[in-house]
Curated annotation (Swiss-Prot):
Gene Ontology molecular-function annotations: hydrolase activity; metal ion binding
Family classification: Belongs to the Nudix hydrolase family.
Lineage: Bacteria, Bacillati, Bacillota, Clostridia, Eubacteriales
Protein name: Uncharacterized Nudix hydrolase CA_C0446
Superkingdom of this protein's organism: Bacteria
Pfam family, one: NUDIX
Motif Nudix box, residue range(s) on this chain: 69-90
Native source organism of the sequence: Clostridium acetobutylicum (strain ATCC 824 / DSM 792 / JCM 1419 / IAM 19013 / LMG 5710 / NBRC 13948 / NRRL B-527 / VKM B-1787 / 2291 / W)
């Protein structure tokens, strides 16, 4: 497999070079990632779509996370990250259909590695039922939708769990309906401010 290279940045997001993805995570270089939240509106309710990460992922296995995300490779633009929607969810979207809602810095310590990201966050509105999505099964093993008002109460610690509904895929590729209450241990631990950026944009109607 061809080695993947990423552009690296200082803390002010000034370009300082190019390193392999392995070295970026080993040495904790800042790099860019594409995060896209798929939004589904049903009547007066608005839902965010969360993906369930594959159980063999090296980071946050089996946890629920942003609808679609990926690294921006060296020389790519942030908008090139739209390919992740196609690869992970089977969604054909054009860059001009996505709404850019901001950038947030995040830092994760994973074993001996340090993952420092400039997360470029986008919103994509899609009317399709999540059951129609085509998953990249070595990356994603399920999708759920969560209503944003309930999610906001959950993040503010006003409720202990949040209702999620969707499906999971087993090793044979069969889909099973999923309806359950999720708690904070079920989610990738993004900063509180990360989710606030997303919810504020949705509640302000972008």
């Amino acid at each position: 497999m061809e080695e993947e290279f990423l552009d690296i940045f200082d803390e002010e997001e000034r370009l300082i070079g190019r390193k392999s993805r392995k070295e970026v995570h080993e040495k904790g270089y800042w790099h860019s990632t594409f995060h896209c939240w798929v939004v589904k509106r049903e009547g007066k309710k608005t839902f965010l779509i969360f993906q369930k990460r594959h159980p063999l992922k090296d980071t946050a296995p089996n946890m629920f996370d942003v609808s679609s995300a990926g690294h921006i490779k060296s020389g790519e633009s942030i908008e090139d990250g739209v390919r992740e929607l196609k690869e992970e969810l089977g969604i054909d979207a054009k860059p001009n259909e996505l709404i850019n809602i901001g950038i947030i810095k995040e830092e994760f310590h994973i074993g001996k590695n340090i993952d420092r990201e400039f997360c470029h966050i986008y919103i994509y509105s899609n009317k399709a039922e999540i059951e129609s999505y085509t998953l990249q099964r070595d990356e994603v093993v399920g999708l759920v939708k969560i209503e944003i008002d309930e999610l906001a109460r959950f993040l503010d610690n006003k409720i202990d769990g949040v209702f999620a509904e969707g499906f999971i895929v087993n090793q044979e590729g069969r889909r099973y309906k999923l309806s359950k209450i999720l708690n904070k241990d079920d989610f990738v631990p993004h900063k509180y401010g990360y989710y606030k950026i997303v919810l504020r944009a949705l509640m302000d109607d972008y």
